[in-house]
Amino acid sequence: EIIVELYEPNDKVGKSILHISNVVHGYKDIDNALGLKVNESGACNMDVICSDGLPWENEIKSVVRILTGGTLCTGTLVNNTAQDGTPYILTAEHCNPQNMGNAVFRFNYDSPICGSQAVANSQAPSGSPQTINGSSFIASKQDSDFGLVELNSVPPISYDVFYAGWRNTGAVSSTAVCIHHPSGDVKKISFDDDPLQNSSQNGVSNNMWEVETWERSTTTEGGSSGSALWDQDHYIVGTLFGGSAACGNFLSDFYGKFSMSWTGNNAATPNQRLSNWLDPTNSGLTQLSGYSPGTPTLALDGTISTVNLSSEVFCSAYIPVE
C-alpha cells in the first residue's frame, strides 16, 4: 500500500497535476545494491588513511560515493560564499545530475587501515552507512562536464563533513590531488606531482586540465568520474571527465576546469554555471577556503567604550618591608 499526499496552496485547490516518474522500493540493504566493492579497484590505488593522505584530512571528509541509476560516481561537498552549509555536491555532467533525485550519497566510505597498493587488503568501515538519499538538480554544462546538485538534507554533525574550498581563476597548479571512489571502492587518493597542462576536449577550446601521468603509483578508474581535482593550496580546480590512466600505465586523465564551470563557458542561464550558486552573495571572490560546520565561529560583535575613572582613592594600605 502506498499513500501519496499532495499539498496545494489555497488559491490552487483542485488545479494541480501530479506526475510520478518512477517508484523505488528499497527492500535491500544499501551495501547490497551494488555490493561493498571493497578491493575491487586496482591494487595500485592508495587508501586515504595512508600517510600520504594525512595532509588532506579535511578534503577527504568532503568526498562522497554516489550510487545513481545502477551506476557509481564520485562527488564533493562544496562551500559557498554565504558559508551557510547549503549541501551542494559537485560532480560530473556525464554522471547525469538531472536524474539524481533518488541517488544515494555515502559519506566517509573509507578503509580504517592503510591496506592498499598491494600491502594488504583494504577494509570497509564499521557501523551503519552514513548516507543521504536524494537530491535536487541545480546546474550542469557539458562544455566542462560539471554537475551540481543539492542534497535533500544537510549532513548531520555526526558525519563530521567538510565543505571544500575552490579557486575559479584558471591558474595553472604546480601539483594536484584527486580524492575518489574508483570502481565504487573505499575512498582513494591520487597524486600528480607535476604542473597541470591545458587541454581541449570534445571540440571545446581550453576546457580541461590534463594530468599527464599520476605519481606515487596512483591512478583513477570508472567510479572516479566527477571527483574533484585540488591544487597545491587545497582549492578545487577541476572535476574528472575521463581518461586512460590505469594501474601499470602512464597515461593521461582529463578534468573539466572549475574556471569554465564557474561561468558555464559564458552560459546565459544560472542552471548552466556555478557562479550563481557558489557565490550567492555576489562577492566576486576568486577563491574560497573550505570549512567544517562542526567548528564554532566567534561573532564579531565586540564594541569599544570609554570608561571614566574617578580620581578618588577607594582604599590604601602601608606594608612595611622587613
Question: Where in this protein do the model-derived segments appear?
Answer:
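Disulfide-bonded cysteine-rich modules in secreted/extracellular proteins
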Residues: 298-304
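C-terminal subregion of chymotrypsin/trypsin-like serine protease catalytic domains
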Residues: 89, 118-131, 139-141, 148, ...
